[in-house]
Amino acid sequence: MSIILPDWVAHHNDDKKGKLSTIFSVAVHPDSSRLATAGLDTKIRIWATATILNPRAENNSNSHRLLSTLSRHTGSVLVVRWANSGRFLASGSDDTVALIWDLDPSGMGGGSFGSSEVNIESWRPYRRLAGHESDVVDLAWADDDEFIATVGLDSKVIVWSGTHFDRLRIIDGHQGFVKGVVFDPLGQYLATASDDKTVKVWRTSDWGLERSITDPFLTSPSTAFFRRPSWSPDGSLLLCANAMSGPVFVASVVKRSSWSSDIYFVGHENAVVVTAFSPKIFVGFDGGTHSCVVALGSLDQSVSIWVTGLEQPVLVARDVFERQVMDLSWSADGYTLYACSSDGTVAVFHLSPELISDALSAEKLEQSRAKHGVKRVRNVAAATNGALPIGTSDRPNMLQPRKAGQSQAARASVPPVPIAGSVPPVRPIASRTERLHQTITITKDGKRRIRPTLIGDDLEPSQAVSHHHAYQPAPTSHALMPSIQQHQLPAMREAIGGTTVDGFGARPGVNGIHAGMTNSVSDGTAAAVVEAVLAAQRSNPAAMTTPMAAASSMMPYVPIGLPFGIMPEGASPEDMMQFWTEFQQRFMRGKKRKAEDAEAGSDSDDIEPIGKLQKGKTRADIGRTLGSEHPRDPPGPKKVLREALTGASGIVENGVRKGVHLAVPETLSIYRRDEDGLSIEIRNFDESRPTEIARLDPSDKDRVLWLDFSPTAATLATATSFFSAVALEDSTVLIYSSRGGRIGNLLLDSACYRLESNGVVLMAVTVAGLMYRWNIRADHEIHRPVSVLNLLGDPENLFSITVHANGAPIVILQSEKAYTFDDKKLGWVCISDGWWAEHSEAWDGRTRSRGSEVSVRDPVRAIEAEINTMYVRRVHGDNQVGAQEESDDDQTPPVEMSVPEDKKSDFVIAVTLRHLEARILAATILDSANEYKNHLIAYAKRIAEEGIKNQAEDLIKSLIGPIYYKPEKNQDAAWQPTILGFDKRQLCGQVLQILARPRNLTSLVQPYQEILANMKA
């Protein structure tokens, strides 16, 4: 075996030369000729593997190392994966978008914008997959490229078509970040791994949940950015990352037959973040039929390679990387493993048959898969694409040397530099400028409409389309087609007749069908087609050995997007008759529909708005949305229909507050609230007309999504992507689903003072001072109504009240205090105070309010920024607000506090520690994991600096827990082994290292270090 460390395979920071940027993902092309890497620098780079594996090629000046740099993403690229056909490259980024890349055969090459790197190959974005609301962390292609699945930090799993890349299904079954995805090689399941401590297996037939696997992840940490799972090539084993066996980090093996997870790979010192099965099966060591080879990458910076049946790994690489492993990828031969790390380097592990045994043939692999009883009906179009010369699999590395100042024509005359497996060059396609003809028309409103038309230099239009997708027509061969049995015909017919997408669609060039072939068959009858096929078979039986081969020579050219099936081998004439009858009906309906669309389009140059009935269509044909059929009236000027009722400072009778304490909001003729790209609008009228409630799409010219009416005027509204809520004057709150169905009608104790929402949580504060909170998705109340009057003191003291992303309320007061509600203790908790801004040494006086985006990521910091802004204004006398505004009538300024000189030091230490403790508590309640860990470490450092032994011991005991604690036997214990996804004992280890630095705490720390070490052992 050998280990290769190509230092030139790297992503360099543009602003800091020589410094390497993190490489998040690595993927080897199915023909092993190319290596794609994805980096923190927002770029994808494609490298020639020949220069990596072959020292002679690496040292050859004529060999190209970097083939292309792809730079269309606007954020860090977190994952790259090649399609199994080899044609497409898919990438996912933290810009929330996944891109599908395709090699442009007519591309000019050159360099990326803003980069000096020269591209030998020209890769262009083929499709843009937009649908996630946060980082796209992982993606996977189905084995036959029928589907592609993307997962992200928005907790969603989105399944796309692998042929036309339309969105097929959104799976919203996880409750945490989804960080890994893999398809079953048999095509039956899709597995996803999430921070909600589950791996879920979904059926590809209906995308329903088959099994949720939880046992290996009950105590797994959430610190890992990836949880990349892998499926064995024979489909029998699912390998899951970031699993735990007690306190030990493991990779869990899940058996397909029973979904049991009692087998582990043990040995890594930190979480396993990526798993990868070799695509081959090998001769078994343990006397079994075969064995599999698997690689693991961990946060402990090491890579291990295992063979099933052996108790020990065959390779453990500990010193290859300086930082954690991010991704793994096997080449098609099953012996070469590529790994990347966050230190910005790539390593290649080339194994020998002596180390891991001999690989078995593809026939043996198919036999092993067949044992599961799953009939693998492959997507014909997707499977066939892999055999076409339109991708890169059949021409793995056709490279041309480029010279400065050399024209495209001159470069075309330079002989290509072939690499093993390349195909002969073909006549270059006309440049894009030659193929594009534009028709520009001016609409009635003065806008330009550009209608591009592809035309060829010496080709018919249909031929130009075919050449755009392929260098040359693929020869017809039934050997390239998957074997489809006779009993599968009804399913194929159903797919042909019942779908409007090209799941079975043929692209130009499929089965020898290209633009040069005659289209006369499409105008004939099905009987004529069959007769022609049979006659051709009788006249030339050698050339037409099967009905399929005969039919392929007579098939008309079918445009991309037309549903279309492929006849199986051995089909009878009756089956072919039925097939062509159904196909012809679909084909002629498509032509008729296009003619109708063209006729309708010629009537007017104006584009009809969405929601307006199309010509010749009725509401029964296309359905409708309430309020979308008629143009919406202009809102007109905003008027106050009812003045606000000012709140009282408090009416007290017999020690009990009574009456209205907070202001009743005014009733406006127009009330609109825009939140997270959504808008909800209220239009109030006099008593002669009902109130209109509408949800609008501001990105589409305020298109009405749904409309409702109310006999009572509305005062407040709020909306999220899950629901909308409206508060009425009669103390009623109406709740609507995202599509406009009314799912709630709640009568509160009094009218609403504030109505806020976030995610699935709705919060209402009434004028009587009671706060209500509901989880709309779970359809239940979070807690009983709680008073906010004791927080305010005076209604004017309220600065803001919002709902955090996890549903916790955040109340910020003008008196420089911030509170949230602890659902466990059912009480208000002070999480920030201007007192700390004045006296705590941990306070950051430079922070300022930066908006909602920061509050979601770092809520504690954002809250302190608001308090700090108030504090600075008060101290500097600029727009004085805050603590000087008291509810007392005399407005007496606060008395300055003084601390005796001999106690000032203890005073500062005490205030600082109380401040850090409040930060830790706030981060816990607001589910801010990163802030929790940062403040915990800062708290430990401060205790160590001051040498405070009693608080140090309290901190250690809270993290180490009971010495004899066993999760499986003590489920009801009050102590929990994790907090916010962190393992408490791991945190305890870090805290002990900090507390061990001062000598006066050594005697306290050492016994706990020994106890913790024994627990891990």
Curated annotation (Swiss-Prot):
WD repeat residue numbers: 18-57, 72-111, 131-170, 173-212, 221-261, 267-316, 320-359
Biased composition (Basic and acidic residues): 618-638
GO biological process entries: chromatin remodeling; DNA-templated transcription; regulation of DNA-templated transcription
Residues annotated as transmembrane: none
Cellular localization per UniProt: Nucleus
GO cellular component entries: chromatin; HIR complex; nucleus
CDD domains: WD40
Region (Disordered): 387-438, 591-638, 880-899
Ranges of biased composition (kind: Acidic residues): 598-608
Top-level lineage group: Eukaryota
Any Pfam family: Beta-prop_CAF1B_HIR1
PROSITE patterns: WD_REPEATS_1 (PS00678), WD_REPEATS_2 (PS50082), WD_REPEATS_REGION (PS50294)
SUPFAM superfamilies reported in the protein's UniProt record: WD40 repeat-like (SSF50978)
Keywords: Chromatin regulator, Nucleus, Repeat, Repressor, Transcription, Transcription regulation, WD repeat
InterPro entries to which the protein is assigned, alphabetical: CAF1B_HIR1_beta-prop, HIR1-like, HIRA-like_C, HIRA_B_motif, WD40/YVTN_repeat-like_dom_sf, WD40_repeat_CS, WD40_repeat_dom_sf, WD40_rpt
PANTHER family from the UniProt entry: MEMBER OF THE HIR1 FAMILY OF WD-REPEAT PROTEINS (PTHR13831), PROTEIN HIRA (PTHR13831:SF0)
Task performed by this protein: Required for replication-independent chromatin assembly and for the periodic repression of histone gene transcription during the cell cycle.
Family: Belongs to the WD repeat HIR1 family.
Name of this protein: Protein HIR1
Species, as recorded: Mycosarcoma maydis (Corn smut fungus)
Gene: HIR1
